[in-house]
Every structure is written in C-alpha cells, then in structure tokens.
C-alpha cells in the first residue's frame, strides 16, 4: 500500500483521535496536498515543526492500527466479499455450482468475526 493511501485510510479510521493541530496538518498535507512550507506559513511555524507534527501524527495513527487493527479487518472483509461476488457470478453462469455454498460459508465467517467484536 502506498504511504499516501495508507495514511489517508488510517486517518479515516483514527483521525478523530489525533490532536486538533495534527488533524489539521494531516488534512492540509495529505488531503489538500499543501507543502510543508505552505502549511508552515499558514500556521506561522517552521517547516521542521510541521514535519515533526506530521511524523508524530503518522506514528500515532500507525500505533492505533497496530493495537486495534480496524483497517486490516476492513481490508480482509472487503477481500472476502469480493470472493463471494466472484463465487456467486460463477454460480449464476453455471461454471461453479459450488459457489453458493462456498459463499454462504464465507459470509458466515464474516458474521462470526463481527459477533466476536
């Protein structure tokens, strides 16, 4: 996963847990594609201060993911749902008659995992 995409995804899940300043810097840098210098000028701080704040925010987001794993769970669930769609497509076309039963099994596993949360 590219770093840019990874941080945006982590921010979607855990961004509200960051400080307001970290949230603002992440949004400006990753969301609005401003440079460190542009953010520094806007907040009347040094580029180094912006860089340090971004790195701390990125590390905090990564730590949340390591502990909670919500992005990982979402990604795995998405892959499973794509597999279900493919199996059902095969079932409908007659190419994979076992697709319906396999799909049910995958969906049951997803539900079981959600109930464990």
UniProtKB/Swiss-Prot annotation:
Q: Which Cys-Cys disulfides exist here? A: none
Q: Which residues form a coiled coil?
A: none
Instruction: List the InterPro entries.
Output: RNA_pol_sigma_r3/r4-like, UPF0122, UPF0122_fam_protein, WH-like_DNA-bd_sf
A Pfam family found in this protein is UPF0122
Transmembrane region(s) = none
Task: Tell me the protein family, please.
Answer: Belongs to the UPF0122 family.
Summarizing the function annotation, the protein's role is:
Might take part in the signal recognition particle (SRP) pathway. This is inferred from the conservation of its genetic proximity to ftsY/ffh. May be a regulatory protein.
Which PANTHER family does the UniProt record give?
UPF0122 PROTEIN CBO2450/CLC_2298 (PTHR40083), UPF0122 PROTEIN YLXM (PTHR40083:SF1)
* NCBIfam families documented for this protein: PRK00118.2-2, YlxM
From the Swiss-Prot or TrEMBL record, give the protein name: UPF0122 protein Dred_2057
Lineage, highest ranks first: Bacteria, Bacillati, Bacillota, Clostridia, Eubacteriales
């Amino acid at each position: 996963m590219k770093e840019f995409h990874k941080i945006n995804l982590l921010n979607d899940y855990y961004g509200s847990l960051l400080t307001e300043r970290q949230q603002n810097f992440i949004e400006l840098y990753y969301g609005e594609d401003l440079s460190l210098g542009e953010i520094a000028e806007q907040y009347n701080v040094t580029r180094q201060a912006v860089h340090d704040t971004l790195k701390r925010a990125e590390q905090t987001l990564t730590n949340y993911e390591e502990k909670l794993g919500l992005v990982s769970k979402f990604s795995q669930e998405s892959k499973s749902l794509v597999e279900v769609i493919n199996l059902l497509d095969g079932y409908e076309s007659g190419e994979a008659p076992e697709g319906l039963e396999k799909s049910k099994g995958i969906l049951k596993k997803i539900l079981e995992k959600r109930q464990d949360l």
